[in-house]
Every structure is written in structure tokens, then in C-alpha cells.
């Protein structure tokens, strides 16, 4: 069944942090907006992000330091103009998120910042210990309040140029299809690494909806891509218990003092090195026969989480890492009393669609933001930069798309 055509100024595909930020910005700029999302509004990888969001707001920090850290961690493969846009937009992104209700954590009246891998200074802000989930809650409410039309359980089936815009064919959960004609489209459907992991038989940290068909559709239309085969593995994916397969212990676990050890108990890497350095070191330890085996034979390295309370005092883990602590407790493991086995797990696509500083792809009237894009993170992303990316470039793309649609 095909229902009547719908029309809008801006069609946003995807409803993670980037899609919701884009929709809000486009509405603020006066455009009519339709958001389509495969399941519920906000169901995305954004909501799974535990660690935090980076922004240079500290008195001893600068956007220049953040810029250099981001480029360096990405092996200088990032687009400097995009990296500059990301980091310079950081402080304003935090202020905006706070204004829509994200409850950032404070210590003694100041925003708490901690240091994470690849960063020279404490720069990671948190909203409790599930920053992404708090962001999604605030963004979802802001989208609903903005007047954007949201079509849940609706996927993008096809996209084609139509006059001075685009015609999208969408499919609802009941199988009915609806064409949507839009002056401008913003793609914010993620990198789809969950689907890629399934294809090759690996686990991933991704949301079940994280499949790459929208990225592939844009590439098939002729949009230029970059670094598409650059996939990031989160260093500390849970190996055991089996019920935690695909779960990654957040990098803050290591920021707070957890250390990595081989089977002999020797440390083998700087735990706060960039993600690919730590992940490669764990893989190398296992390949060299220095790893340890879980009861089912799966290999990994030890993450000594017991060091956190030893270094910071009893109760620190239960307070600062309650979500991690409780997930393991439900599986019969107390991470304050025993080490856990970890091994890198597929996490993030570093590359994607080529965009400029306004979020424009190489196709007319087609914008993109978030993990579906490339160039922002080079070939290795810093922890906390993905949430920042969704907000900075989501807002930029939404505003620019609205301006073009209304011109």
C-alpha cells in the first residue's frame, strides 16, 4: 500500500544525536521538517555512549590543544577544516546541551572534566555515567517540542533526485510505503558498523538498527566517500561472562585507574594511549600467546578493575561506574573484587561521506552529519569526540539545510 506523498523543506534520515540535533536546528531556522527513523525516536548508538563528550572548556585547556590531539590521534588523516569546526564548536555545544536539559556532572560547582585516551588534558564532560542516554532524553524532548514531524518505525527504501530536491520512498513497519518530497535531505543514519559486524561474524557495540544501507545508498547515488574501511575497535570489549558479549567497558574505567595485564600479570601498554594503540596492543598480546582464556576458551587480556577502589578509595567504583558495576554484578562478577577479561570489539566507522564545514556532501542539496560522515576523526577517533560530532555537525547541517531549502 502506498499512501499519498508528503512534502517538507528538510527531511532528516536517522534520529541519533546528529539527526535530532539537525531536526531541532532546521526547525529553529524556520523550515518544515520530517524525521524518519527505523524504530523509536532516539534509538541509536548515541544512547549507548557511556563515557562522555569532549570539549575544551577547562581553564588550562584550549581548542588548539583539542585540535592537535584530534588530528594526532587520527594519524593526521582528518580534514583540518572539519576538525577545526568540531573543536571550536565544542564549548557552544556543551552550553546548548545544558540549555535543553542535559544534566552535566559538577564537582564543587564546576563541570567535572576527566582525561581520556589520546588527550593531553582533562577534557571529557559527563552527565552521570551514561552521557549518551542523558543526551538522547533531552534531545528527544526538544525534537518533540520543536514541531518537527517524527515518523517512527519508518525506513528509507530509496532516494532519488527530483527537480530542485529529493524524492524519498519510505516504508513503515506495516509494509506501507510513502513517498516524501523534500527540498533538502540530511542523512544522519550512522556508520552502520553493527551490520558490517554481522556480515563478518563479529560482535559489535552497536545498536541493532546500526546497519549501513543509507550510507550505501548515498554512495550508489554518487556521493563521495572516504576512509570507509577504517573501522575502530573499542579496546575493552567484555569477553566474559558470555552474557556481556558486545558490551564495552567505557574508557573512563581506565581513566579512573584500571590497568591492563597479560597472563603473567605484566602491564603492556599505556592505558590512556589512543584507542587503536591500546586495541592493537591487546590483540598482539593474545596473538603472541600471552593472553588469558575465559571458561569458554575465548581469549583476552586482564583489565584490573580492582585497582580503581584501591587508588581512589572504597565505594568509588560503585559511585562513578555504577552502570558498569551493576551490569557485571547481574552476571555474578564484582569488578571491585576481581579482574575482567577484555578484547577489542567493533565500535565505530571512522570514515564515511565526504562533507564540507557546512555538512554538505558532494551531491547537491544532500547534507550529512554524525558517524555517516568521514574526515572529522581521521582514521582513529578520540573517545568523546563522537558525541561532540553529532551535536556540532548535526546543528550545522540542520541550519545550513534549512537555509538552502528556504532560499
Give each language-model segment a name.
Residues 5-8, 175-184, 362-363:
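Core beta-strand elements of the Rossmann-like FAD/NAD(P) dinucleotide-binding domain
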Residues 41, 217, 223-334, 400, ...:
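An anion/pyrophosphate-binding glycine-rich loop and adjacent beta-alpha core
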Residues 55-86:
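Glycine-rich active-site loop/strand segments that organize a redox cofactor
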Residues 100-176, 184, 188-192, 197, ...:
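Conserved redox-cofactor binding core of oxidoreductases
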Residues 190, 360-382:
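Short FAD-binding loop at a beta-strand-to-alpha-helix junction that anchors the flavin cofactor
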Amino acid at each position: 500500500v502506498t499512501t499519498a506523498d508528503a512534502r517538507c523543506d528538510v527531511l532528516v534520515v536517522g534520529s541519533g544525536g546528529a539527526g535530532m540535533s539537525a531536526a531541532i536546528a532546521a526547525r529553529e531556522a524556520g523550515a518544515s521538517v520530517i524525521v524518519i527513523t527505523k524504530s523509536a525516536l532516539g534509538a541509536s548508538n548515541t544512547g549507548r555512549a557511556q563515557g562522555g563528550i569532549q570539549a575544551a572548556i577547562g581553564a588550562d585547556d584550549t581548542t588548539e590543544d583539542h585540535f592537535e590531539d584530534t588530528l594526532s590521534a587520527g594519524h593526521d588523516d582528518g580534514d583540518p577544516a572539519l576538525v577545526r569546526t568540531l573543536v571550536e564548536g565544542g564549548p557552544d555545544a556543551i552550553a546548548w546541551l545544558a540549555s535543553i536539559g542535559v544534566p552535566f556532572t559538577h564537582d564543587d560547582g564546576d563541570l567535572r572534566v576527566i582525561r581520556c585516551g589520546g588527550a593531553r588534558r582533562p577534557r571529557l564532560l559527563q552527565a552521570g555515567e551514561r552521557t549518551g542516554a542523558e543526551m538522547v532524553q533531552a534531545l528527544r524532548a526538544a525534537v518533540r517540542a520543536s514541531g518537527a514531524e517524527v515518523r517512527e518505525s519508518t525506513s528509507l527504501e530509496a532516494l532519488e533526485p527530483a527537480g530542485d530536491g529529493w524524492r524519498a520512498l519510505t516504508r513503515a513497519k506495516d509494509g506501507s510505503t510513502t513517498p516524501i518530497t523534500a527540498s533538502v535531505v540530511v542523512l544522519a543514519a550512522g556508520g552502520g558498523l553493527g551490520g558490517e559486524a554481522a556480515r563478518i561474524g563479529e560482535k559489535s557495540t552497536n545498536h541493532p538498527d546500526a546497519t549501513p544501507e543509507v550510507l550505501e545508498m548515498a554512495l550508489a547515488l554518487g556521493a563521495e566517500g572516504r576512509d570507509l574501511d577504517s573501522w575502530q575497535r573499542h579496546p575493552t570489549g567484555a569477553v566474559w561472562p558470555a552474557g556481556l558479549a558486545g558490551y564495552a567497558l567505557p574508557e573512563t574505567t581506565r581513566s579512573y585507574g584500571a590497568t591492563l595485564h597479560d597472563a603473567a600479570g605484566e602491564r603492556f601498554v599505556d592505558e590512556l594511549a589512543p584507542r587503536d594503540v591500546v586495541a592493537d596492543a591487546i590483540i598482539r598480546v593474545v596473538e603472541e600467546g600471552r593472553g588469558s582464556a575465559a571458561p569458554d576458551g575465548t581469549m583476552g587480556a586482564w583489565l584490573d578493575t580492582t585497582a580503581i577502589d584501591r587508588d581512589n578509595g572504597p565505594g568509588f567504583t560503585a559511585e562513578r561506574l555504577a552502570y558498569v558495576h551493576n551490569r557485571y554484578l547481574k552476571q555474578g562478577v564484582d569488578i571491585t573484587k576481581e579482574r575482567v577479561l577484555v578484547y577489542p570489539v567493533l565500535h565505530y566507522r571512522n570514515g564515511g561521506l565526504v562533507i564540507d564545514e557546512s555538512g554538505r556532501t558532494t551531491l547537491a542539496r544532500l547534507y550529512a552529519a554524525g558517524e555517516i560522515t568521514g574526515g572529522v576523526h581521521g582514521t582513529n577517533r578520540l573517545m568523546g569526540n563522537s558525541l561532540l560530532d553529532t551535536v556540532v555537525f548535526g546543528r550545522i547541517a540542520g541550519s545550513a539545510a534549512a537555509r538552502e531549502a528556504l532560499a
